[in-house]
Amino acid sequence: MGIPVLAPYHGELAAKSAKFGGFKVQAFDLPHDGVPNYGFFIRMPNGERFTYLTDMEMCVYNFRKQRLNHILIECNHIDENLDEEEAKYAHVVRGHASLRVVKDFLEANWTEDLQTVILCHANALEDTGRMLREVKETVGEDVAVWMAEKRAEYWLNNEKEGDK
């Protein structure tokens, strides 16, 4: 018996939800420069709610009523740091979320239930310290905010591996 895999590039997925053990997963469209892309709303076995948002220009959906506990979201660049003359400028702007987009999403979706924000897919040349500071200012001191690192594991209880 195989393991079913949810892949973000199958067009029929956007209209589907699935269960994996105690996890309930709902896929939704995310704009990514004309390429099919999906985010995921996940209800975990303990009832907590999680969104996965990456490779996107923005998220047009609002999850305030779902009272998110955990958010993994792309924070690729800071708008004013982009060079409009650079060859990749259009690709970056049309296909990836800026710090401003992330802060707008977090402001629109913040509730007192939010516990964790993990930023991912940052441009290697960006000021990730600034990204972390500004997101922390947006969501408040009670919310754990991390920049995803390669091979790191994160527990969704405000602790990162090694923080215990």
Label each residue range with its predicted role.
Residues 4-6, 51, 116-118:
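A structural signal for isolated positions on well-ordered beta-strands in alpha/beta enzyme cores
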Residues 1-7, 69:
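Active-site metal-binding motif and surrounding structural segment of the metallo-beta-lactamase
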Residues 8, 53-55, 120-124:
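Structural motif
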Residues 10-66, 70, 152-164:
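Core dinuclear metal-dependent hydrolase active-site scaffold
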Residues 2, 22, 47, 114, ...:
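A generic structural signal for alpha->beta connector loops
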Residues 61-151:
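Cap/insert and terminal regions of metallo-dependent hydrolase folds
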Residues 1, 32, 121:
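Histidine-centered divalent metal-coordination motifs
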Residues 7, 27, 145-147:
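A structural preference for short, hydrophobic beta-strand core positions in alpha/beta folds
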